[in-house]
Amino acid sequence: MKHPIHVTSEIGELQTVLLKRPGKEVENLTPDYLQQLLFDDIPYLPIIQKEHDYFAQTLRNRGVEVLYLEKLAAEALVDKKLREEFVDRILKEGQADVNVAHQTLKEYLLSFSNEELIQKIMGGVRKNEIETSKKTHLYELMEDHYPFYLDPMPNLYFTRDPAASVGDGLTINKMREPARRRESLFMEYIIKYHPRFAKHNVPIWLDRDYKFPIEGGDELILNEETIAIGVSARTSAKAIERLAKNLFSRQNKIKKVLAIEIPKCRAFMHLDTVFTMVDYDKFTIHPAIQGPKGNMNIYILEKGSDEETLKITHRTSLMEALKEVLGLSELVLIPCGGGDVIASAREQWNDGSNTLAIAPGVVVTYDRNYVSNTLLREHGIEVIEVLSSELSRGRGGPRCMSMPIVRKDI
């Protein structure tokens, strides 16, 4: 294997992808804590698992190697000291010592096998799991209506966000919301210690210790030389600028970063919830991200006179900016919901724009977004529909649920 990570486009034939099968963390959602854990509803676990399995099998049927985050994480933690270090960091970042002694919870977690340990950390630790005899501090014995010592991580099935493959390296991301911060720790340990990746010295273009947030749903690889990044509710302009400088100074293939400002709201959480690439010259778009005349704030970042300087060019037309950076004379923006004010809002809420391209002109979408799917087919796109009644409750689509590890070049 020359490069364990290789992604130079959004549409190159998908060869290897990272998923996370929804687990106990979904059943640990309750109405009182939905907002805190970034959910709007509670999926039904048996059905969301069936739907996710269908999604994974759909990818396998097209020749894609499917890896699972939970399996890789367990395989990475073979060393005893490494396990302890990982648990220490999870507990510290999860602020678990507020209601229980760090050592008490650490000993409980380390009593499990690697596979069970990862599932337990992802699923959360309820207070009633720790025996009363183990609680030796007054604050551990206090009645508290909050049910968890360690919060569940229900957003983990959206593997796109904690890390993003960029060329032969990746970003391991500082997540904006506290509920998701721990998620990228799994990828840090997988890249450093899993035998599939550890021996290759994979470049980390931006790591999770950088103080400003960036999330993978905002990172789109347009081609070998150009990436687009959303300036969104979850990704800051400062992180984009730092990533651009790192890329320009540490490698020579990516020459342009397109920063695309989108409205900062939950419905438009990441760039890929409102804009995705489906073919060489075709993109989906949610019309509501554009102004009355199609105006937007777009900035083309290029290398400046030195490593800490950028050349920044402002553009106001997404269509023209894409033509410029991709070297195209024409391209097509396909509106989510056909541009109908009701259908576009409804289907965007259920991730009608969040397509996963598995080859040029071939995409995986949710079956429920029939207006958008019909329009994609009318534009010559092969649309592979997957089940979505429960998966869509997390406000993420096929692109959100997948982290491409390897794609063929286009």
UniProtKB/Swiss-Prot annotation:
Keywords: Arginine metabolism, Cytoplasm, Hydrolase
Predominant location category: cytoplasm
Source organism, top-level taxon: Bacteria
GO molecular function: arginine deiminase activity
Catalyses which reaction(s): L-arginine + H2O = L-citrulline + NH4(+)
A matching Pfam family: ADI
A GO cellular-component term linked to this record: cytoplasm
Compartments where found: Cytoplasm
Signal sequence, renumbered to the chain: none
Protein name: Arginine deiminase
Organism: Bacillus cereus (strain ATCC 14579 / DSM 31 / CCUG 7414 / JCM 2152 / NBRC 15305 / NCIMB 9373 / NCTC 2599 / NRRL B-3711)
